[in-house]
Amino acid sequence: MAIHLYKTSTPSTRKGAVDSQAKSNPRTKLIYGQHRCGKGRNARGIITARHRGGGHKRLYRKIDFRRNEKDISGRIVTIEYDPNRNAYICLIHYGDGEKRYILHPRGAIIGDTIVSGTEVPISMGNALPLTDMPLGTAIHNIEITLGKGGQLARAAGAVAKLIAKEGKSATLRLPSGEVRLISKNCSATVGQVGNVGANQKSLGRAGSKCWLGKRPVVRGVVMNPVDHPHGGGEGRAPIGRKKPTTPWGYPALGRRSRKRNKYSDIFILRRRK
């Protein structure tokens, strides 16, 4: 990803480092409007997810996570910005006339050819079952359930690694450090998701954050005791507790949020870092 730095003409642009990917008009038949209801509120209008609200209107791009155009080669026509994710997307024109969006693989350029199916070449952007991939292959957009479409390693710069195959299962090391089992019949895309430098962007000003639908975050230590467990005290005071807590008194850092005794625990060989 190319990072664009502005001239230091104003305080808001002095520290801004934004994505220079050009915005383009998406294909009309592959988009639809979405009603972003609530924006952090429930049906009664009560805040259930803090720091959300506002933001620019978005059109949702239909992304082909299934890659079910089997054994039909396609050509990358455009590489586009998608407001609904931090990864880029690219428009594919297939040989049978079908046009679809997929996640942009790192290093893919306009004019490259991709294909999905069984026994296809192990090259960037191709999608095939895990059983046909050699060990050590870098992959993304990985299926958990056969035919459901890719669900793992879809964020910008995400990449997983195929480290073992035994019986009906394949062992993957995910970007989070988790090691888990997946059916060998599930499909994945070869390569890494593009826009690797997405986490290096610096918006530079609060207004850019507001466009993304993210509201300001207030520290609990500057609140009153009635509003937050960290609040209160004379002047600048510490939180007054051994460990940080949420506004509702639960442990804030290091607490495991995964559901206990979840059905998929048997497939996880090593928990994420």
Curated annotation (Swiss-Prot):
Top-rank taxon, per record: Eukaryota
Protein name per its UniProtKB record: Large ribosomal subunit protein uL2cz/uL2cy
Key words of the record: Chloroplast, Plastid, Ribonucleoprotein, Ribosomal protein
MF terms (GO), sorted A to Z: rRNA binding; structural constituent of ribosome; transferase activity
Subunit structure: Part of the 50S ribosomal subunit.
Region entry Disordered, spans: 1-24, 224-254
Encoding gene, per UniProt annotation: rpl2-A
Family: Belongs to the universal ribosomal protein uL2 family.
GO CC term (a single one): mitochondrial large ribosomal subunit
GO terms of biological process kind: mitochondrial translation
Gene3D superfamilies: 2.30.30.30, Nucleic acid-binding proteins, Ribosomal protein L2, domain 3
Subcellular location: Plastid, Chloroplast
Database matches in InterPro entries: NA-bd_OB-fold, Rib_uL2_dom2, Ribosomal_uL2, Ribosomal_uL2_bac/org-type, Ribosomal_uL2_C, Ribosomal_uL2_CS, Ribosomal_uL2_dom3, Ribosomal_uL2_RNA-bd_dom
